[in-house]
Amino acid sequence: MIKLVLLRHGESVWNKENRFTGWKDVDLTEKGVQEAKRAGEFMKKEGLDFDIAYTSVLKRAIRTLNLALNEMDLQWIPVNKTWRLNERHYGALQGLNKSETAEKFGEEQVLIWRRSYDTPPPALEKSDERYPGHDPRYKDLTEAELPLTECLKDTVERFLPYWHETIAPTIKSGKRVIIAAHGNSLRSLVKYLDNISDEDIVGLNIPTGMPLVYELDDDMKPIKNYYLGDPDDVAKAMASVANQGKAKA
């Protein structure tokens, strides 16, 4: 039986401030650091082991992975970083407070922007400092690959080719894999693995810093999945993610 572990980064500074983060390279909070370490402790206690890791080019995911692997004495394993595992780009919403945006545009509209499959937020202009083309880490990307905004469908379309061409063959070769990434890049993979409909994906929330274990058969089809940690803590964390886009009472 194959085990694949998905880990959303620990709480970031902009998670704490309830801002749309996207491709902005913000760091972990102290709580996020502790979440990452705790994730490593849970995985070690579970007896998990890894041969190779995949993450994004954003420090909140990279640091989470490093902190978790350190708890497992696995910092020596190869780590592949790719922009294809980045969070979805939130376009002109990037940096805005989610509750204030809900007050301005309505909770329903913000929920559509945050969670719908194929409705992107308002796009950036290329002259905007938030446009990824101004960031040297993306200098090798084509203009077509640099997003002005993204919906989940766009994130799926940039992630899945990497899954099929790189990660899945690595797993099939017998390597034990962990993917440390972001809420929406991981939602993209979960949607594919569990064959979740475009409509039902709206209700899927992935909490920060909690390892999600997939048990797969030899055809890479899920047998079951489960979070490591206290079930009540997992439920509370998922509810917290769901409530981020609501207007302040």
Swiss-Prot record:
InterPro entries: His_Pase_superF_clade-1, His_PPase_superfam, PG/BPGM_mutase_AS, Phosphogly_mut1. The active site is at residues 9, 87. Keywords: Gluconeogenesis, Glycolysis, Isomerase. The gene is gpmA. CDD domains: HP_PGM_like. Pathway: Carbohydrate degradation; glycolysis; pyruvate from D-glyceraldehyde 3-phosphate: step 3/5. The lineage of its organism: Bacteria, Pseudomonadati, Chlorobiota, Chlorobiia, Chlorobiales. Gene3D superfamilies: Phosphoglycerate mutase-like (3.40.50.1240). This is 2,3-bisphosphoglycerate-dependent phosphoglycerate mutase.
